Amino acid sequence: IRLATNERELAWMRYIEGFSKIIGFDMEIIPPEEILRHNPFMTLDGVIAGARTTEDGHADPSGICNALAIGAKNMGAKIVRKNRVTGLTQLPTGEWDVETEKGTIRAEIVVNAAGCYARQIAQMAGIDIPVTNMEHHYVVTDPIPAFKDRDEEIPVMRCPHVSGYFRQEQKSGLIGVYENTGLAEAWAPRGGNPEWDSTSELFPEDLERIAPWLERAIERMPIFGEVGLRRFVNGAIPHTPDGGPLLGPAVGLKNFWHCCGTSFGIAQGGGAGKYLAQWMVFGDADINMTEFDPRRYGPYADEDYSRAKVFLDYRMTFTTRLPGEEEPDGRPQKMSALYGRLLSAGAVYGETYGWERPKYFALDGAEEEGGYHRTNSFDAVAAEVKAVAERVGVLDLSGFAKYDVSGPDA
């Protein structure tokens, strides 16, 4: 259940509910009293509604990985553990020699599913990808007496006010925090790259950094505050600039695919593997993969851009974004010669494939308001449409795709 504490968050839930019905995803918006029926231990100060996904839950990541591995073996896959890749070389045939500590493997296709190591693997193949590893905390409490007498668990709860999630972990409580101040890149002294011999590496907890959000979680779930904190876990999670995974063919390489940048990890694992496999085998997937295609990024998405956008994505994990809202982080990257002139004339810019493109002109100088209904951009856009329809307009096409078509029948 995700909580809404204002109309902005409720509007987003209604938007999600709309297309959930179209695709057959089971979700409902429930009132506060219904939330309490599912989780009677909460305080709902300021909560106006909740989005309940009836088929969701939580699972043990290790158990899921083992189940997937067993299933793969049953279908003929061979798994070699504790065998580090040391190099990648593409042959004239398009095949790859994958050099490992236990010998070289000749592969028709390579899939980069290396998690926090994905960028380093990509660099072995001669390319780079916009992935930044972030530190992320979760905390486990001591056993909670109120949970011991219950046969059912409370739902996983997500709360923008907490900027995190909380749930039951056996008979204890678990709080995960996405702090929006004092963020830390994992392995920052090493350029964000883990050591090759690192396995399941954890970092020292930073209680001061996450304390304000833990306090908010305890305000929502007072029974968490009745016991001690038993365990702090601070680990690494890879993120991409827009928060979506990299699933698809690598830019500029043949027979090299990405399956990485999944900031929600094992929760995305089954779907990522299924649809990527369809794409690889049949040339297409059952769903539109455009939002995940690694080719959505170009050379502009360098290390600095990736870091700026990933920090933004992390700190806004529980912030509701509305249509029309654009953040300045990592911008501008690509500008036409008219950028400054149009900006001084009131252009409101959006970012597309790294390009700064005017969306409309705010003659009153007001910033664009986001929303699902008419906003302050409506009248300005209407006036521009009328002007072009009745007279003439000039459009800067620098940030749009161009196609060079040549040949006898062009």
What role is predicted for each listed range?
Residues 51-109, 113, 117-120, 270:
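Helical element adjacent to the flavin cofactor pocket in flavoenzyme catalytic cores
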Residues 100, 104-153, 287:
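Central helical "cap/lid" subdomain
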Residues 161, 170, 184-188, 197-334:
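C-terminal catalytic lobe of FAD-dependent flavoproteins
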Residues 1-38, 161-166, 170-176, 201, ...:
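Dinucleotide-binding Rossmann-like beta1-alpha1 core, especially the glycine-rich loop
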Residues 125, 139-140, 145-184, 205-208, ...:
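Mid-domain catalytic core of redox enzymes
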Residues 1-2, 36-75, 97, 192-201, ...:
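Helix-loop-beta segment of a Rossmann-like dinucleotide-binding subdomain
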Residues 287-288, 294-410:
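Glycine/proline-enriched, intrinsically flexible loops and inter-domain linkers
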Residues 8, 41-47, 89-97, 239-243, ...:
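A short, glycine/Asx- and small/polar-enriched loop/turn
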